[in-house]
Amino acid sequence: MSYPPERIVCLTEETVETLYLLGEQQRIVGVSGYAVRPPEVRRDKPRVSAFVSADVPKIMALRPDLVLTFSDLQADIVRDLVKSGIAVHAFNQRDIAGILAMIRMLGALVGCPDRASALADSLARRLDDARETTVGARRRPRVYFEEWDEPMICGIRWVSELIDIAGGIDVFADRARAPAATGRILAADDVIAAAPDVIVGSWCGKKFVPARVAARPGFAGVPAVQRQALYEIKSPIILQPGPAALTDGLDRLRTIIATCH
């Protein structure tokens, strides 16, 4: 691996967006098929992977000196790349602090630590400003965030933290801290008992269908269903642990939660 790396393959969205924001996009030679931020990435960079699968021969043909991955879900891809002699850095950020640390670490990896620190600091200030607007709110709506529908899976930790910053109460904040998605699987009775005022869906790449949620057995009595407060947030702006979640994702949450005041 050369330093700083000149040919980077990004197998998740957030490192792509971060490198563009740092002005280091010229280093990217391949991206995840889910990468959509900024829009030009779909035109300019070859796609080499889904999330849990990748075209390793295609990656190898790009002659990367560094591949960036995320979480244990890409462990098999990492194994194959390492066995092929490729340098890999696996990120595993699960909360806001981890997202900001990822930005700083990625900046260090590509030789622009000062720019990365400035970006992370500006995002942290933005979060603080948003938090200030909800401090002391007389009412904080109860929010159920659904990341997947079959089985029902509630939001991961950074989403839970963003709900709090946006002025809501995550009804499954305790589950959000689970180390794996299996710890966030819910039964319908869990949601019914939690009585959320708002349901926010982001079904990880497929369209959220409020009518399908409202029609679940027992959901007719859920406050969010009674007042038709079911909303979608597109996955690219909330489920990738990077700048998008801390900006557009947070803004969308704030707009949704504000409707319940």
Region locations from a protein language model:
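N-terminal ligand-binding lobe of clamshell/alpha-beta domains
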Residues: 1-261
